[in-house]
A protein has these predicted regions:
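Short linear motifs in intrinsically disordered/low-complexity regions
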Residues: 24, 75-77, 86, 123, ...
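Hydrophobic, well-ordered secondary-structure segments
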Residues: 70, 88, 110-113, 128, ...
Length: 256
């Protein structure tokens, strides 16, 4: 593989790119994820590199070059993960919050992975006790803030947060210390169930979503409150920014 810059990185070099260039070409050994964090393991000679990728709000890897392709990976030779004779992958990112970074130090890579909480899609699933313990790491926060903190539990994004809290009947602005043990068990179970349903349906049909073949979502995962004017019971939904400027969607009648 070899990289090409464009879009976001047309003038700004991704961290580590200047160092990995001298070791190219490299072989893609694997592509892995933990929560919303993706990394590629690359090898060549006696060197191992890791290409980190975060999606931001709209980033995605695709076989099709989009209008906002910020980074391009060229595949030349055997060992490519790309099928159908496709020789390139494009990191398309409309809002340009996604990132690409190259790391060769295995200790730095291990530290990054250790900084992330258990993946909500882990098998076997994270147990209820550990789930509550991770959410309560910073007890002064609201439950909507804690669910989005990838160091607590990784893999829950904005639309999942809204749907999980609605199904649990929990007001997003409640303190993490206000929840009972039974509510934490429910929150853990619902988080796993809804995250799994979203994963199996290959995401949501929001306007920016495309799968790697550039196919729009098919509405298999439907929202109850996220981006809705009313909840399934007909109550008007409310939207408000959290402390990280992310919009939280909820029903003030159904969620207490």
């Amino acid at each position: 593989m070899s990289p090409t810059q464009d879009g976001r990185y047309a003038t700004k070099v991704p961290d580590g790119l200047d160092k990995i260039i001298t070791d190219l070409p490299l072989r893609v050994e694997s592509v892995d994820v933990k929560g919303k964090f993706m990394w590629w393991t690359l090898t060549g000679g006696d060197k191992t590199w890791y290409m980190w990728s975060t999606y931001g709000m709209s980033g995605q890897w695709s076989r099709t070059r989009g209008k906002h392709a910020g980074f391009i990976v060229d595949f030349n030779g055997s060992g490519s993960l790309i099928t159908r004779d496709q020789q390139q992958l494009f990191f398309n990112d409309t809002r340009r919050f996604g990132t690409v970074k190259f790391v060769s130090d295995p200790k730095i890579h291990a530290k990054k992975l250790a900084s992330l909480g258990p993946d909500i899609l882990d098998q076997p699933p994270v147990d209820s006790g550990l789930f509550a313990e991770r959410i309560l790491l910073k007890p002064s926060r609201t439950i909507c803030e804690a669910l989005m903190d990838q160091s607590c539990v990784s893999g829950i994004g904005n639309y999942l947060r809204a749907e999980i809290l609605y199904d649990c009947g929990l007001d997003p602005w409640r303190s993490t210390t206000d929840l009972t043990a039974e509510q934490y068990v429910q929150l853990r179970n619902v988080s796993i169930r809804i995250s799994t349903a979203s994963y199996k349906s290959q995401g949501a049909s929001i306007k920016t979503y495309r799968n790697p073949d550039d196919v729009k979502g098919s509405s298999q995962f439907s929202f109850k409150v996220y981006a809705r004017n009313s909840c399934p019971l007909g109550h008007e939904t409310t939207r408000k920014q959290d402390t990280n400027a992310r919009m939280i969607h909820w029903c003030s009648i159904c969620q207490k």
